[in-house]
């Protein structure tokens, strides 16, 4: 969310997500081609290159370029992407996200919205102005993108904000626990606009005894 690139930001986030998806998840290294990125995002290769440069300049990617000569194809440029590891403040995506063919700006915007949801939920308890300030886009841009997401069935307004309805996010911490008390605790926190605490086995053992 702190990645500041103006109105190109959602597109850059989408490109980053596809590079991450096409990487080795243990090494965070990707050899995906610009041609493949273009195919997967619907963006032309020139736009892909510009996006990669912004991601590189912002420190989200390290790019190593090699050029090899091929007898039939001439000189071939190939990038290797080293993705900066993220150890905190992350969420999981279902692979179905990458198969839905959303426009890149919508795909990236959806990820930005998820990043400001209450922990382990698809709920945003902010106004459009607050969302714009948090994400770093203009209010008019946020309004237009939210409208487009609503038309695609990816988000719906609720009494105090918005609910993501895309169905491609995995709220793992809640799903991994069967403790009714923990779920009730999370729901209570969310109703009060408070971020639920992380699952703590020792603390829950006290509550459950």
Residue ranges with predicted function:
Residues 1-209:
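Electropositive, intrinsically flexible nucleic-acid-contacting patches
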């Amino acid at each position: 969310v702190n990645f500041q690139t103006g109105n190109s930001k959602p597109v850059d986030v989408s490109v980053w997500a596809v590079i991450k998806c096409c990487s080795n998840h243990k090494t965070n290294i990707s050899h995906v081609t610009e041609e493949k990125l273009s195919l997967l995002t619907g963006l032309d290769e020139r736009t892909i290159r510009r996006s990669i440069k912004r991601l590189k300049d912002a420190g989200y990617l390290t790019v190593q370029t090699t050029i090899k000569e091929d007898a039939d194809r001439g000189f071939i440029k190939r990038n290797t992407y080293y993705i900066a590891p993220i150890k905190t403040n992350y969420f999981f995506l279902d692979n179905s996200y990458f198969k839905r063919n959303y426009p890149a700006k919508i795909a990236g915007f959806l990820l930005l919205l998820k990043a400001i949801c209450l922990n382990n939920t698809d709920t945003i308890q902010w106004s459009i102005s607050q969302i714009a300030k948090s994400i770093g886009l203009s209010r008019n841009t946020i309004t237009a993108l939210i409208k487009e997401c609503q038309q695609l069935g990816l988000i719906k307004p609720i009494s105090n904000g918005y609910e993501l309805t895309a169905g491609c996010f995995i709220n793992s911490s809640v799903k991994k626990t069967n403790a009714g008390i923990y779920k009730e605790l999370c729901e209570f926190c969310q109703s009060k606009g408070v971020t639920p605490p992380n699952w703590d086995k020792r603390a829950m053992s006290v509550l459950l005894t």
